[in-house]
Amino acid sequence: MAYRSLGWSACLVLAVAVCAVTRAAEQPGPARLLVVTVTTGFRHASIATAEPVLEELGRERGLFHADFLRMPPGRPTAPRAPQRKKDTSDEAWAAEQAAFKAAQEKFKQDDAPWQQGLKEQFATAFAPEALATFDGVVFASTTGDLPIPDLPAFLEWIKSGKAFIGFHAATDTLKSSDAYCEMVGGAFAGHPWTAGGEHGFVVHEPGHPVVAMFPERFRWKDEIYQYDPRYKPENLRVLLSLDMAASTPQEPWHVPVAWVRDYGKGRVFATNFGHNDATWNDPVFKKHAAAGIAWALGRMAAPAAPNPEVQAAEYLRSVVAAAAAAGGHDADALRARADAKIAKDPSWAAGLRPLLLELRGRKPDARAELYAQVLAEIEKPGR
């Protein structure tokens, strides 16, 4: 039998084909994400917009396949508490209250089967053998105490090398669990910056891929949360914050908006954006969401080491904005002096944290003394 050697061009074609197959084999396929949109507290109307947007983001980018855990249908409607009108007699009001109490009892009975069905859904979705099939989980504006059957085991699953992605009200979820709040990064404590307002924001790392799509300073219309004292700056790398000087109201504390963190071998990405339908439909937000998901899945390299000094500096700038507004000071001049000190010694603002935190517990009319102490530190020479 006669054999012919391959020509040079044929060898080249074969080599290219082999390399292409090798590269294709090295490229990871779409991840599998469990996307949870169940709420046991307030339910955001924008969830109905978020669900198809998330499915589309994963599919069009080849990044992930979304398996949804949605609200079961058929839940009975809870009764609304009566509001006493001015001309309502005591007798009529007592009757209204009694009727409401009876309606509540009936709702509890009617709601019990629905609650049981919800628990069974979570028991199935969060069983160890089910979680083992996922690369991560998304909490998209979840609220309340979700019936996760074994929360410590779920958190350990994330630590084992999985992704957790939280949108908007993910921080208004499972607030009774310190461990969950520590993982996600914060626990909702109000939203003075409402959904109808346009607020100012600052990007701390314009080159970070999770926030590179935003200008360094910009305005955005969405509802913005503040967080309770369990928030730990030493755990998080905050990439985007509320710019207090460009927002109303001006409160004397730092308001982080988007962050990343390592969690054991796992990765956490959280963004507070997502209350409004318009946010979910915005191309810039979609890039932000996709980049955060890609980072959490380990599909892109980007720093995640905590940046408490950056956060402390932004905290001080927020205090300066609020103090200047309250006392009629020159906010720009004060901020320039504070920034000059921070530039010389990045740890200086972090050293003021105990004083700054004390302001959080003061009502506006009781802050003047602490404002004066902070301004004195800024004006103090020699540093």
Name each region found by the language model.
Residues 1-11:
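Bacterial N-terminal signal peptides that target proteins for export
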Residues 34-36, 66-68, 135-140, 163-168, ...:
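Structural recognition of the beta-strand scaffold that forms the well-ordered cores
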Residues 25-31, 37, 45-48, 52-61, ...:
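Extracellular ligand-binding/catalytic regions of CAZymes and related secreted enzymes
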Residues 130, 136-139, 143-216:
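A glycine-rich, often tryptophan-bearing local segment used as a flexible ligand/cofactor-contacting loop or short
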Residues 21-23:
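Sec/Tat signal peptide C-region and signal peptidase I cleavage site
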Residues 39-43, 72-75, 142-146, 164, ...:
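Solvent-exposed loop/turn segments at secondary-structure junctions
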